[in-house]
Design a protein with these regions (language model features):
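Conserved polar/disulfide-associated segments of primarily extracytoplasmic proteins
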Residues: 80-186
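Alpha-helical context
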Residues: 40-47, 113, 117, 146-150, ...
Length: 239
């Protein structure tokens, strides 16, 4: 798929802040807020041998096949570290990885798969962030990334665990309506994982992993590969 360099304005996906009840620590145990529990992990084991790790300053890490490029998706060489890029996910992301850059000659940023992690923790509950991001991307797939639109149902977020930390996961598919150009696949996949954390003020926040990938035609990355990339998200125990 191809994306213009100014695809979306950074920070355009904004989750609603959930109301919080302050707990004084005094009174019965029944007054204590319920601690969120992690769901099942997506990974059935470690990443495949030979894959390269992509590390985020937030402590999250994921793994990609050895042939993928790691770094700024626009190919910018930053001497002072990775300032982050908005490649169309609606987030400024760091720890980006891209598969099959430039496969389409029609111009803009073309790729088969692109992955990144939000540059900072985003305010609000993780579930709300995952669902808000998915709804916004569904709208972008329908209105911005396709010529005649797309049918993009958005499933509910499901509870998962990332290294034992509660997280919420949404995987959606946009079925592209004809006609479509040579850079638009029949199906556009978009995955979001929002990992629960806390902001500097102690309020709920989340770190967001996003992945966009082509499906449904020759030359795309295998579904098994994409699933393994998503499942590899974890906290880096070396930091």
């Amino acid at each position: 798929m191809a994306r213009a360099a100014t695809a979306l304005v950074a920070g355009s996906l904004v989750a609603s802040l959930s109301g919080c009840t302050l707990w004084s620590g005094v009174g019965d145990d029944a007054d204590e807020p319920t601690r969120e529990q992690p769901g099942p992990t997506l990974a059935s084991g470690p990443p495949p041998a030979g894959w390269q790790d992509v590390r985020s300053p937030t402590g999250l890490v994921y793994s990609v096949p050895p042939g993928w490029e790691v770094g700024d998706p626009f190919g910018v060489d930053h001497d002072a570290g990775d300032p982050g890029s908005d490649w169309g996910s609606g987030y400024v992301t760091t720890a980006n990885a891209i598969a099959d850059r430039g496969y389409c000659r029609l111009g803009g940023l073309s790729f088969r798969t692109l992955v990144g992690i939000s540059a900072t923790a985003l305010p609000g509950e993780a579930r709300a962030q995952a669902e808000s991001a998915s709804r916004a991307m569904a709208d972008s797939i329908d209105r911005r990334f396709t010529q005649a639109g797309a049918d993009v149902p958005v499933p509910d977020a499901r509870s998962i665990g990332v290294s034992g930390v509660p997280a919420w996961y949404v995987s959606l598919r946009g079925e592209v309506r004809p006609p479509r150009n040579d850079c638009t696949p029949p199906t556009i996949r978009f995955d979001t994982i929002a990992v629960s954390t806390r902001g500097p003020d102690g309020a709920p926040a989340s770190l967001v992993f996003v992945l966009m990938s082509d499906e449904g035609e020759a030359g795309v990355q295998p579904t098994e590969t994409i699933d393994a990339v998503v499942a590899s998200l974890r906290y880096d125990i070396s930091v």
